[in-house]
Amino acid sequence: MADSGGSSPWWKSLTRKKSKEVTVGVQPQVRPETGQEPSPPHSDRTSSLPENQHSNILGDPGESLRSDKLCEEKTGNSRRNLKISRSGRFKEKRKMRATLLPEGDKSPEEADFPDDPQEDKQ
């Protein structure tokens, strides 16, 4: 069966993404010994990340994270909105909205129906 275009397996979308600091810390760092004093390991790492540079331009660093979450909820990519069908495919859970009636129309409860049992009791 051919891959559906994704570079990662389907189940990786259900796992949490590891933070970049954790993945960088796991890899061994090779430093050339040129006689210069090495910089502290965590001093400039956060300011050199492209995400943090972008958020500094916007202003509040937490603002970009909040806007990303809002975008995910609006586009329906949130995992809360997905369910897995019996075939294993992801389906979007859709909420049914109550339709709004025009002002001139009455709801079925308010309309005068001749076969309405509640009307006879009055």
Curated annotation (Swiss-Prot):
Biased composition regions of type Polar residues, renumbered to the chain: 46-56
Record region (Disordered): 1-122
Amino acid composition bias (Acidic residues), ranges on this chain: 110-122
Modified residues (Phosphoserine): S39
Composition bias type Basic and acidic residues, residue spans: 63-76
Keywords of the record: Developmental protein, Phosphoprotein
Keyword check for Phosphoprotein: yes
Phosphoprotein found in the keyword field: yes
Biased composition (Basic residues): 80-97
Expression (tissue specificity): Exhibits a cell type specific expression pattern only in the small and large intestine and in the testis. Along the intestinal tract expression is restricted to the non-proliferating epithelial cells surrounding the villi and no expression is found in the intestinal crypts, where proliferation occurs. In the testis, it is detected only in post-mitotic secondary spermatocytes.
Function: May have a role in proliferation and/or differentiation.
Family under the similarity heading: Belongs to the PRR15 family.
Protein name: Proline-rich protein 15
